[in-house]
Amino acid sequence: MAGRTITRADLCEAVYQQVGLSRTESAALVEMVLREIADCLAKGETVKLSSFGSFVVRDKGQRVGRNPKTGEEVPIEPRRVMVFKPSSILKNRINGRTGKAAGRE
């Protein structure tokens, strides 16, 4: 059940339609928000958006992986990964649950 992909341009248009800023101002606003989120994540900070979810940066240590074709062991370097943890409100909305029943999980 794949839906449509929303792009930056779509977000800018939505801000333009709903907030009443000019298209240029709407695009600048969306870019500022996305840049701020990216800058915070690059510094290793968690970005929590109430009723939406949290973007969390995690450090993964070095480990040994395996080449699936040859079976040879390959070292995987330490790295940082970003994960998104949706809020329970967003999870309920995605699953079509609303109201009091949604809050009882």
Swiss-Prot record:
Q: Which Gene3D superfamilies does the entry mention? A: IHF-like DNA-binding proteins
The protein's superkingdom reads Bacteria
The UniProt keyword set, sorted, is: DNA recombination, DNA-binding, Transcription, Transcription regulation, Translation regulation
Which GO biological process entries does UniProt record here?
Answer: DNA recombination; positive regulation of metabolic process; regulation of DNA-templated transcription; regulation of translation
Does the keyword section mention Cytoplasm? no
**GO CC term (a single one):** cytosol
**SMART domains xrefs:** BHL (SM00411)
Q: Which molecular function GO terms apply here?
A: DNA binding; structural constituent of chromatin
Coiled-coil region list: none
What Pfam family is a match, any one?
Answer: Bac_DNA_binding
Subunit: Heterodimer of an alpha and a beta chain.
**Physiological role:** This protein is one of the two subunits of integration host factor, a specific DNA-binding protein that functions in genetic recombination as well as in transcriptional and translational control.
The record's listing under HAMAP family reads: IHF_alpha
Q: To which protein family does this belong? A: Belongs to the bacterial histone-like protein family.
Please give the name of this protein.
Integration host factor subunit alpha
Gene name as annotated: ihfA
